[in-house]
Design a protein with these regions (language model features):
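N-terminal glycine-rich phosphate/pyrophosphate-binding loop and immediately adjacent elements
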Residues: 132-260, 264-265, 269-280, 440-462, ...
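FAD cofactor-binding and catalytic pocket of flavoenzymes
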Residues: 212-235, 239-240, 244-245, 250, ...
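Short, solvent-exposed loop/turn and secondary-structure capping segments
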Residues: 101, 108, 177-181, 240-242, ...
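Conserved redox-cofactor binding core of oxidoreductases
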Residues: 192, 199, 203-208, 218-224, ...
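A glycine-rich dinucleotide-binding beta-alpha-beta segment and adjacent secondary-structure elements
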Residues: 331-336, 347-356, 390-393, 527-538, ...
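Mature-region segments of soluble proteins
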Residues: 2-135
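Glycine-rich loop(s) and the adjacent beta-strand/alpha-helix scaffold that form part
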Residues: 158-161, 165-189, 378, 387, ...
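Residue-level detector of alpha-helix initiation sites
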Residues: 149-150, 428, 643
Length: 680
């Protein structure tokens, strides 16, 4: 894309030169020359260039005094069409100057003190399980597991250690960590272009929105698409690592709160007491850093955390004092990150982009570097990458799986047999596969829900959020299942430092959206931004669901259609968390508080999606039995977040792991007979 001299000058007013380079020389020129993704802005930039010429009244825009250039840009930015066109220029300027990306070190990163890998740290790659390849795949296994995330990984480990011959099918390529971090334009959490952890083209979904249905392919908006992570290890490859236990009330939501009209709250078929031994094992097997104290008083424990909690940092100190003034309990967040060397891997080096990016030293604990390597070490587990299960069949004597392998090259169809098929593809894809295969009852796909989120931020007088990880540091559970917020409330944690591009694009109120003052804020006061993030109960509804859409994927299968309804009780949770977050920040001395708001139904699915094959004691109100077997089937077992009847007031991954341990342990002890077709 060509930029005229006038547009280049405009870029340098959006990000002016001072003692640091201006926008064009500081990264935008190189970005524009190298990026293939900017075609969306071509018409807007042509209009903007022409309008600048008109406003300059015959003089080249580049020759005007900086103050005059700013005046004209402000005129443009105040009109409807001009505002949209100028916003396109501003976006490109910020992407070029503040976005980390492969092979580029724009000046904005140095301006804000951002280093993706801390100085002096030598990256360490994960030793991923090898690819068995098409030629190594047997046609007959004891178990075929679809998905390598926390549920599938746990199932693979327990079954392989029990002597069962296992095949894990993973849709993603065997990508190294280096390919899954450091690109702030395509990272899973902040992707503005095709996400690196996305499934790619040929994997459409339909978002059934109130205003109109929208077809999204695997290269589109990661948020609206409902992307978790298309990677070996699933979401645990890229997560922040918050590893909470659900509270006892989280397993009894219907009993504790009743069922508001239009909702489908249900109790789990297990209690916290039933789950506690599996939580203890999950923390040990995964590797969780934490400490006993205020955050563990309501979740009785039989073991201590295997790793010490991460040390303090400025935001924790400030918010801890504020919590104590309010009489709230607080503590360090339990994280599945190595706070010290563990399991043959290094300690966390506190990189500034833990959330949504792979770890530079393999200190982030997930399925890819814990459960699956242990499964492979038995000699009983194969992993087939770059492969998709397109159909599963349940039978009296065996189960069948149809797989498309080598999907990034010349695809090959494989027809495989197993005693058991474990479906662990996440709440959306698990439901889609079961529905497309004609498996299960009417509850398959229903009760899709996630969490409710609230973010409040302000400014304090000191630097509290420099670019140093791992990210979230302090939490309070005082508003979880207490009288302060209805319907179970949610956990409140400190907000992670926003990545440079995100911070530049969304400065705090009162800071100009571009120009000299904006750049000065980025260089200094940005680190004084203190936020509190709330994550709480979302009340499930039967019509929030995954169905089969009127689109086809590259194999001719129907894509998932996602419908999200928001119950008024969920909004009460969200608003309640915002009130308590503001209270905490005021106690910490923050000023200029503002609530970051998004659409009520930003996405029907996301990282925490659950409930689409929920467990229960009765097929009239659930999709599976208490051990993940869809009602009416013999040899199909679900083993992921789809099983969650409700999703708790905290992050769900440790519960996914603990429940997978319980489900897989039962499967080992109740293996289906190969001839009679029954489960003991």
């Amino acid at each position: 894309m060509e930029f005229s001299s006038g547009l280049r000058a405009a870029v340098d007013r959006v990000i002016p030169q001072d003692d640091r380079p201006g926008g064009w020389a500081g990264g935008v020129a190189a970005y524009v020359a190298a990026s293939p993704d900017l075609g969306w802005a071509a018409d807007a930039l042509l209009r903007l260039d022409k309008r600048l010429e008109e406003l300059a009244a015959g003089r080249p825009f580049v020759d005007l005094a900086p103050e005059h250039q700013d005046e004209l840009l402000n005129i443009l930015a105040s009109g409807p069409q001009g505002a949209a066109d100028f916003a396109a220029l501003r976006r490109i300027a910020f992407e070029g100057y503040y976005a980390a990306r492969e092979g580029a070190s724009p000046a904005g990163l140095d301006l804000v003190g951002f280093r993706a890998v801390p100085e002096g740290v030598e990256p360490v790659e994960s030793d991923l399980v090898p690819d068995v390849g098409i030629g190594g795949v047997r046609r007959d296994y004891d178990a075929i597991i679809i998905g390598s995330g926390p549920g599938g990984g746990v199932a693979a480990q327990l079954l392989a250690q029990a002597g069962r011959r296992v095949l894990v099918i993973e849709r993603a390529l065997r990508s190294p960590n280096a390919a899954l971090r450091g690109d702030h334009l395509r990272g899973k959490r902040n992707a503005v272009y095709r996400p690196t952890a996305g499934p790619g083209a040929g994997h459409p979904r339909v978002a059934l929105l109130p205003e109109a249905d929208r077809v999204l392919d695997g290269v589109d908006d990661a948020s609206l698409y409902g992307l978790n992570a298309n990677a070996m290890g699933g979401g645990t490859r890229l997560w922040q690592g918050m590893a909470w236990r659900f509270l006892p009330e989280d397993f009894r939501m219907a009993s504790v709160y009743g069922n508001p009209e239009g909702a489908s709250l249900a109790d789990w078929p297990v209690s916290y007491a039933d789950m506690e031994p599996y939580y203890s094992r999950a923390e040990l097997e995964l590797g969780v850093a934490g400490s006993e104290g205020n955050l563990t008083t309501r979740t009785p424990r039989s073991t201590r955390y295997p790793l010490p909690a991460f040390g303090t940092e400025p935001a924790r100190e400030l918010l801890a004092g504020a919590a104590e003034r309010l009489g709230w309990g607080w503590g360090p967040i339990p994280l599945a990150l190595n706070s010290e060397p563990h399991d043959g891997r290094p300690a966390c080096v506190r990189c500034p982009q833990c959330v949504g990016h792979a770890c530079p030293v393999d200190a982030k604990n997930g399925s890819h570097n814990t459960f699956l390597p242990r499964a492979a070490a038995t000699g009983n587990c194969d992993v087939l990458y770059d492969a998709e299960a397109i159909e599963v069949q349940d039978g009296s004597g065996d189960a069948r799986v149809t797989v498309m392998a080598n999907t990034s090259g010349d695809p090959v169809r494989l027809d495989l047999r197993a005693d058991v098929v474990v479906v662990a593809a996440g709440a959306v894809e698990t439901a889609r596969l079961l529905l497309a295969s004609g498996i299960g009852n009417d509850h398959i796909g229903r009760h899709l829900h996630d969490h409710r989120f609230a973010t409040v931020a302000g400014t304090v007088t000191e630097s509290v959020k420099p670019y140093r990880g791992p990210g979230h540091s302090i939490a309070t559970l005082d508003h979880v299942h207490t009288d302060s917020i209805r319907w179970g409330g949610g956990v409140l944690v400190d907000l992670v430092p926003l990545l440079p591009l995100t911070a530049a694009s969304t400065p705090v109120p009162g800071v100009p959206a571009w120009g000299k003052e904006h750049k000065a804020w980025m260089a200094g006061q940005r680190a004084n931004m203190l936020g509190v993030f709330g994550m709480g109960q979302e009340i499930p509804m039967p019509m929030s669901r995954v169905t089969l859409g009127d689109v086809r994927d590259r194999w001719g299968r129907p894509g998932a259609a996602l419908r999200k309804l928001v119950h008024s009780a969920s909004v009460e949770v969200e608003d309640g968390m915002a009130v308590r977050a503001e209270e905490w920040l005021r106690s910490a001395g923050a000023t200029g508080l503002f609530r970051q708001r998004g659409p009520a139904t930003a996405s029907a699915a996301g990282e925490h999606s659950c409930g689409t094959a929920r467990m229960g004691l009765d097929p009239t109100s659930s999709a599976t039995d208490p051990f993940g077997r869809p009602w009416g089937t013999r040899r199909i077992v679900v083993c992921d977040s789809s099983l969650h009847a409700t999703n708790g007031s905290v992050n769900p991954t440790l519960t996914i792991v603990a429940n997978a341990l319980r489900v897989a342990e039962h499967l080992v002890s109740a293996w289906p007979a190969t001839a009679a077709g029954r489960i003991a």
